[in-house]
């Protein structure tokens, strides 16, 4: 069958781009329809800072009957295309297609050709045009599970399409999961936590919204100590920390955000949010006033979200390896034991295999198991060039790295 490709250039085209997955996944119960505006905002120069130094283009594919059967986007960021890369590298993403090899290859071709015309020599995919904590990677394991909010879900046949075209694994991203009922930590971990709890210098507690200013500064302090030891990681300023917290504030549950203190100084944090995918699927991408009211009711009143989404955690270097990570998890468990929280499971996403220290820490001290796997692929336009996988996250100095997860914007590859 022959296909016609069309550049997205009108409001009607954009609606086709947004609505295609709704048709492809209508019989897939695990898939959760994202908010239309979440996708639309990625390609809006007024709302996506990546356009300050880059460009993006989208295509639709139509069959002989005029039915939309595929889509793809390609993009590049001039500021970061060479960062930690041996060649200028762009990206492709938001790929969707019926199960047809010819169609998939046509979409990959048009993305590759456009990127090459703009000076790129490789493309990563499927990725986001912006932050790595959304729409990044191809699901290759865990199809039976519902995705976390803004995490990709796709059918199994996509893996074959990417790999047969010539994409190679640049890095893997693991999602870990664990129950949060009593007794889900190992005996060794409970013993470590008990030793800390017996020392009055240590304290573990959830935040209070009235103390948000103190939380912002504590978060920034720990983050900068925990992550400044990694190459390529910038210090977080107050404006960035405040912006992050203000973004999360509407959905924050203070009993999902924990800090560890030593002599009243912050030494660790663990930030979770309610996983919105538990309640937004029924909205079919729409978020008008009625759905906003339903959303608030389900989240704040009915408390229908039973899954916590671990966004990021960190421990200062001098406290790493002492059980502080487990202490914060145990504080959360104790809150769950009171019976006032609806959460029964915790998932931690975007833990890259380029950071084996973090993987070991999550498995050993958080007692979480691998639950899903996504792959970030890379395709080199020069097919004779040697392919190299993403290098492990390097340290600036000899101290052991602080625990942190998923910190999606601090990997050794760059945002495209």
Enumerate the predicted regions with their spans.
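C-terminal "cap" of GNAT-fold acetyltransferases
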Residues: 176-193, 375-415
